[in-house]
Amino acid sequence: MKSTDLMHIEPLELYVGKPYKINDKIICLQPTIGDIIDYGETAYFSILHTVCATPADMKVRLFDGGINWMEIDNFELFSMIAPSLPVEQTSIILGDLNLSALKTYRSKENGEIILANPEQRVKIDRLIYERMINCLRKMHGLKANNEKAHNKATMRAMIENDRQTMELNSKKEPSSYLLPLISSVRCKMGWTKDYILQEGIYSFFDTVNRLNVIDNADHLISGIYQGTVDSKKISKDQLNWMRELK
């Protein structure tokens, strides 16, 4: 029996590459490594992070637009961003859902702001948004950035720090995030290129994380037998490489 928790996502379904159905109009797709390469790795992670962005992620842009990032929530930011995202860019993760066709309305039920396209009978309220973004983050191992500043001086410092980071990153040569991971998995697992191209992004990241857990457990066990690691200071969970990854 499946969980009745609306925020729950079956990890096994993600692992085998199943799309996650929010409702009849909204489905989160899981691309393969090959899909991401064909789309363009840089463009893919750019659109992913834009869709999943929190106000803290965009504090510089919001500040430059006269908005304090701590005075809006995640859904309000998404409502601002969504109309600028054409379906051609988002289709790799959201299929036919056209965010650029959505407009802001007030719900007749509770007065809350919603995004909707009445002609297509598409509606995104806060709950639907949270379910959609929760799925995309879980697929890619992303954590929400909800950092806050405790005073104005700290706020200005955080904004300037992010601005400097953005400027430095803009001057760097483009590099691949996936290549070192793919290369490592191939060397460790002996997978062929064709096999990796067919791997869903969730199962691929799961493999990367699992390999790290296995290596760590092996080193701990080796250290225990050699007498260089005190077994009393190591939890049994750390030695169990088949444990659930979190």
Over which residues does each language-model region extend?
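Hydrophobic, aromatic-lined core segments that form the binding pocket/scaffold
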Residues: 76-171, 175
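An amphipathic, hydrophobic-aromatic interaction surface with interspersed Lys/Arg
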Residues: 1-72, 131-222
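Generic structural motif recognizing short loop/turn segments at the entrances and edges of beta-strands
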Residues: 16-18, 23-25, 41, 88-90, ...
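Long, intrinsically disordered, low-complexity Ser/Thr/Pro-rich regulatory/activation regions
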Residues: 224-246
